[in-house]
């Protein structure tokens, strides 16, 4: 278990800004990726500008897809919980790599990145690598405000505003997603 956690932390922290992660995998873990991986933070500042709030994401470029192709869907993955980091689902369920308990990587032939650009978002703020220096998120309404702000900033920054968008998840994400969709439609 400790190797799983260590491997997860190394993989996630190794690309904390939008960077091609291939050199890291080649040099550090001996694994050769056939696609690009990115990660970073989006500032959340629409509704709470006085707080230092950041939402963490990892972006897995669709296998064989051009990052600039507007026809490639954006697939958002939200873990359940509440309080479970989406990076867990990324490395154990829907992402392109599995991390085994011994720390070894295995390619996931059924990854959702085979169908589009996969984005795993740690939410609500305070979960995983997302953080808030103000008051904690305590309800779905506030989580919806943060997610709407995140998604607007993320899609704008990556120039994905015209791409098809799918928001998916498991467990408690089924509670969040309808609320997020309502906020997105209103904003």
Task: Give a label for each model feature.
Residues 157-158, 187:
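Secondary-structure transition/capping motifs at alpha-helix termini
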Residues 2-74:
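Catalytic-loop region of hydrolases
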Residues 53-54, 58-145, 152, 183-186:
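N-terminal cap/lid subdomain of alpha/beta-hydrolase-fold enzymes
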Residues 83-85, 169-182:
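Glycine-rich nucleophile elbow surrounding the catalytic serine of serine-hydrolase chemistry
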Residues 159-172:
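Alpha/beta-hydrolase fold nucleophile elbow
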Residues 17-20, 24-32, 119, 149-154, ...:
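Non-catalytic N-terminal regions of enzymes
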């Amino acid at each position: 278990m400790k190797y799983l956690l260590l491997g997860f932390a190394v993989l996630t922290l190794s690309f904390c800004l939008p960077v091609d992660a291939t050199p890291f995998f080649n040099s550090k873990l001996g694994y050769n990726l056939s696609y690009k991986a990115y990660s970073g933070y989006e500032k959340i500042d629409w509704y709470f500008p006085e707080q230092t709030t950041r939402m963490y994401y990892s972006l897995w470029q669709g296998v064989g897809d051009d990052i600039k192709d507007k026809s490639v869907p954006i697939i958002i993955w939200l873990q359940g919980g509440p309080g479970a980091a989406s990076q867990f689902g990324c490395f154990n369920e829907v992402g392109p790599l599995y991390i085994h308990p011994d720390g070894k990587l295995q390619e996931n032939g059924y990854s959702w990145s085979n169908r589009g650009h996969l984005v795993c978002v740690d939410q609500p703020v305070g979960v995983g690598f997302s953080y808030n220096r103000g008051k904690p998120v305590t309800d779905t309404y506030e989580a919806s405000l943060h997610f709407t702000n995140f998604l607007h900033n993320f899609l704008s920054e990556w120039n994905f505003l015209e791409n098809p968008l799918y928001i998916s998840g498991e467990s408690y994400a089924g509670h969040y997603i309808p609320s997020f969709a309502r906020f997105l439609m209103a904003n």
